[in-house]
């Protein structure tokens, strides 16, 4: 889990000082980091934060604490990208695999919960298991999120957005969520992620 999220989750944050305990203490360090960023970039620069609205693990951050944290950070952040999962549990670490039980748009429900609960005007974004334009449009049309983000879909097909805009969804080379791009982005592989469906992401045979 990344540094800021490790403070926000009660699973990873076991501190007993002012940076641990209740949600406000756990959000103290992230708020300090975001405030310093805001001070440096000014009010005219958009700041987006990736945020676990659910850890998918017993004892993880609650929906109530997640919403309260977003409101607490709302004066120093513009967009919250709602994701989920945890490396502390094998199931929670593989929830985005295509063969897993969670399906597509797996974090849209938590983004929707954040939109319902927060009192601030922070833009809520969802990410995870959204690899078709129609699904992205559905999530937005149903009001589950203000924005939709994706990453691996663009590794599979860098022209994803262009094809979607041209209404050629059938030509999109879909991400199959096999995680090869994640398991090969290591120094041993020259820091170049591979892709099962995109041969351009594979080093040429010598």
What are these regions (language model features)?
Residues 1-206:
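Flavin-dependent oxidoreductase catalytic cores
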